């Protein structure tokens, strides 16, 4: 990575500041929509709220944002960039060589983050639309919750439906809209806080600690389940590191944090002024003059849509990284935008839409959604903390110091997890079941890959290159193709899967001028595109190690075209002049790609568990993208050959020949 690129990553600019507001802070920036309402509702309503309760609640929010979001994520986690990319899978790639078991927290963290992303659009958009209840002209319509649900579903349908077109032009508006949003949060919060300056005492952590043991807190430590809603977007902040750069997050976070805290203080001040009024409105909207509420609802809806868009885009990125790390099934990916960072996965998009819509229909109100929200993300944060501990040790921090520092954050997050665990019975099981389903798929996919690696045998190409040369020159066989390309997941120096040589020499001898063996290796860097070539001292065998970053599309034909030209220009590969062509001077022959697909046989080596894993993986493959599409072969000549996973252990079933009777025997 060039120094100029590194400097740009750490540099803050005015444009980067605005862009960061639109991409990074959607989730955490819309938390004021529902956090204070959740606290009041769980306390039993405005009539049950005291000054000590409000001061303690705001103090807990302030110190949660300070300890978890600011110190852990902004000051520590943002340092753990993988070639300027963030997120739990990027962090995992930095430390995975330190211990094999680290795949477990990576899977758990990724699955819970993905499941949480299905709930965020539901709760944010519903909360925004419910704000219409506070608008006198529309309250009669939206007091009927069914109308809230229908409006929410319509917005979600449009939002998910537009994903296939990318966020190109409209994405440029996200930053300015969120700048207005945070400014409104800060200004309205400040104006309300001036009416009750005593709310500023919440900066003192004494009020936070006192509330946890105070009898005025009806829920005890479980109040932290609502407090945690204020920091659910911290993980997304780290995941979006690569989109905006570290410098822009450092520059924008203080502004965002101040505006958010002012909003909470302003809502708290309004609650103190109206706690005896019996008003049953969301403090966020009620704290604004009636004449301005409709505009605030519109702005809140836009902010909710932007937050949802960020979560949807983040889910696409998360899944694509998991696929390239070989811990998730392959799904079709398209790139609707002008850059690789803007991607679209149809299966994930419509799965998220289905889950989000069902969430809205099942829970109906934002209050019920809030009761289930946050449980999954506490697990994600705990898993990130585990990986961060290993990262700090890898970077030279003394193990004891790194362990103590991360143990401090793990303790805080574990308390939040315990406080949120009660949400399981109030709808949190929906997110947990979804997360477990995702983990199950990840485990099956990863375990299946490991089983194949365990049983597949390799042979040396050097031992068979003479046979391959004889086959190439044997005119008794028709020319199968000028170039035959075998794609393999396993190739080490001259060792390749036995099934590939079986396909060339035994199954149906395939005569070609050049035999290619291509292995795509996913690197820890996000945007690598390099290759190595070993021709085994021949001009008819080419072993290619293609190194692609974990965010790069694996469209093999496009890369192979460049490699062929490089080899011919350097004289290592003979030119393949074509007698019949519509392209004058064409010097490259035709290609056929061959993919070997292993299927489970009834071999005795496989244990019952291994057989279950492989059969389940085969079932999952029915709904995933084919290798043809994944490797960009849909417009190329390609063949898939099916071979048993194990060739050696074929059971010899007893069978006896019945001999025909002779004439003498019949007589």
UniProtKB/Swiss-Prot annotation:
Transmembrane segments: 16-36, 58-78, 101-121, 146-166, 167-187, 221-241, 253-273, 294-314, 343-363, 373-393, 399-419, 424-444
A molecular function GO annotation: potassium ion transmembrane transporter activity
GO cellular component, one term: plasma membrane
Topology versus the membrane: Multi-pass membrane protein
Subcellular location: Cell membrane
Substrates-to-products reaction catalysed: K(+)(in) + H(+)(in) = K(+)(out) + H(+)(out)
Domain of life of the organism encoding this protein: Bacteria
Disulfide bridge partners, by residue number: none
Pfam families on file: K_trans, K_trans_C
Protein purpose: Transport of potassium into the cell. Likely operates as a K(+):H(+) symporter.
UniProt record similarity statement: Belongs to the HAK/KUP transporter (TC 2.A.72) family.
Protein name listed in UniProt: Probable potassium transport system protein Kup
Species per Swiss-Prot/TrEMBL record: Streptococcus equi subsp. equi (strain 4047)
Gene symbol of the encoding locus: kup
């Amino acid at each position: 990575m060039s120094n100029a690129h590194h400097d740009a990553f750490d540099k803050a600019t005015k444009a980067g500041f605005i862009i960061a507001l639109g991409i990074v802070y959607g989730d955490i920036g819309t938390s004021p929509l529902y956090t204070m309402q959740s606290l009041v509702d769980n306390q039993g309503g405005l009539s049950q709220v005291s000054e000590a309760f409000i001061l303690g609640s705001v103090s807990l929010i302030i110190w949660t944002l300070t300890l978890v979001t600011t110190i852990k994520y902004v000051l520590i986690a943002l340092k753990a960039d993988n070639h300027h990319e963030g997120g739990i899978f990027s962090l995992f790639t930095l430390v995975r060589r330190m211990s094999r078991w680290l795949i477990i927290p990576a899977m758990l963290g990724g699955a819970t983050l993905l499941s949480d992303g299905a709930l965020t659009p539901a709760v944010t958009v519903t909360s925004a639309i419910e704000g219409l209840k506070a608008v006198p002209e529309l309250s009669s319509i939206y007091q009927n919750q069914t109308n809230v649900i229908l409006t929410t579903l319509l917005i979600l349908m449009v939002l998910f439906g537009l994903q296939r077109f990318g966020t190109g032009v409209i994405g440029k508006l996200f930053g300015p809209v969120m700048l207005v949003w945070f400014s409104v949060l800060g200004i309205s919060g400040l104006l309300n806080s001036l009416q009750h300056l005593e709310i500023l005492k919440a900066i003192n952590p004494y009020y936070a600690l006192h509330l946890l043991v105070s009898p005025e807190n009806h829920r005890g430590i479980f109040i932290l389940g609502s407090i945690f809603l204020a920091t659910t977007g911290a993980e997304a902040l780290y995941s979006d590191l690569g989109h905006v750069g570290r410098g822009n997050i450092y520059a924008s976070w203080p502004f965002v944090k101040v505006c958010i805290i002012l909003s909470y203080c302003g809502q708290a001040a309004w609650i103190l002024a109206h706690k005896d009024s019996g008003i049953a409105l969301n403090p966020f909207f009620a704290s604004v003059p009636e004449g301005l509420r409709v505009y605030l609802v519109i702005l809140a809806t836009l902010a909710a849509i932007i937050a949802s868009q960020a979560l949807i885009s983040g889910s696409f990125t998360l899944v694509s990284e998991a696929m390239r790390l070989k811990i998730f099934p392959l799904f079709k990916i398209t790139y609707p935008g002008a850059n690789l960072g803007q991607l679209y996965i149809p299966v994930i998009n419509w799965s998220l839409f289905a889950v989000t819509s069902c969430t809205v229909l099942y829970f109906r109100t934002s209050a019920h959604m809030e009761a289930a929200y946050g449980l999954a993300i506490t697990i994600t944060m705990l898993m990130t903390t585990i990986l961060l501990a290993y990262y700090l040790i890898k970077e030279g921090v003394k193990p004891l110091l790194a362990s103590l520092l991360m143990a401090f954050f793990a303790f805080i997050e574990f308390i939040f997890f315990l406080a949120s665990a009660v949400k399981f019975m109030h709808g949190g099981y929906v997110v947990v079941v979804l997360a477990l389903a995702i983990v199950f798929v990840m485990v099956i996919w990863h375990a299946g890959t490991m089983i194949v690696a365990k049983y597949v045998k390799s042979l040396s190409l050097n031992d068979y290159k003479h046979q391959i040369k004889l086959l190439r020159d044997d005119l008794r066989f028709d020319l199968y193709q000028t170039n035959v390309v075998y794609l393999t997941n396993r190739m080490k120096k001259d060792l390749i899967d036995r099934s590939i040589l079986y396909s060339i020499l035994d199954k149906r001898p395939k005569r070609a001028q050049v035999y290619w063996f291509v292995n795509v290796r996913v690197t820890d860097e996000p945007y690598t595109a390099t290759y190595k070539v070993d021709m085994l001292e021949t001009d008819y065998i080419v072993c290619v190690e293609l190194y692609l970053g974990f965010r790069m599309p694996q469209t093999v034909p496009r890369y192979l075209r460049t490699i062929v030209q490089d080899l011919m220009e350097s004289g290592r590969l003979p030119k393949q002049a074509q007698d019949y062509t519509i392209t004058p001077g064409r010097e490259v022959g035709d290609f056929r790609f061959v993919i070997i697909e292993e299927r489970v046989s009834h071999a005795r080596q496989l244990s019952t568990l291994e057989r279950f894993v492989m059969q389940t993986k085969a079932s999952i493959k029915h709904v995933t993208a084919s290798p043809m599409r994944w490797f960009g072969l849909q417009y190329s000549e390609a063949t898939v050959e099916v071979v048993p996973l194990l060739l050696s252990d074929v059971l010899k079933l007893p069978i006896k020949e019945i001999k025909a009777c002779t004439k003498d025997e019949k007589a």
